[in-house]
Amino acid sequence: MKTEIHPNYKAAKISCASCGTVYETRTSIGDINIEICSACHPFFTGKSKLVDTTGRVDKFKKKYKMQ
């Protein structure tokens, strides 16, 4: 590698604002704050909700008399 053309690669902490989990990694950016991480995101924790749209479809059809 050529010297003095690459950015400084240093240890950094990625901290989640939602749950407070801190991940340690190496990056050229520095410390990073994120809103949500895999430890608290509903998709990864298995607490995701299924949105039921059948009521919306029926309301639309009734509104425009499509039945």
From Swiss-Prot:
One Pfam family this sequence matches: Ribosomal_L31
Domain of life: Bacteria
Keywords: Ribonucleoprotein, Ribosomal protein, RNA-binding, rRNA-binding
One Gene Ontology term from the biological process aspect of the record: translation
PROSITE patterns to which the protein is assigned, alphabetical: RIBOSOMAL_L31
MF annotations from Gene Ontology: rRNA binding; structural constituent of ribosome
Cellular component per GO, a single term: ribosome
Transport in keyword set: no
UniProt keyword Ribonucleoprotein, yes or no: yes
InterPro entries named in the record: Ribosomal_bL28/bL31-like_sf (IPR034704), Ribosomal_bL31 (IPR002150), Ribosomal_bL31_A (IPR027491), Ribosomal_bL31_sf (IPR042105)
Function as written in the Swiss-Prot or TrEMBL entry: Binds the 23S rRNA.
Protein family (similarity comment): Belongs to the bacterial ribosomal protein bL31 family. Type A subfamily.
Quaternary organization: Part of the 50S ribosomal subunit.
Protein name: Large ribosomal subunit protein bL31
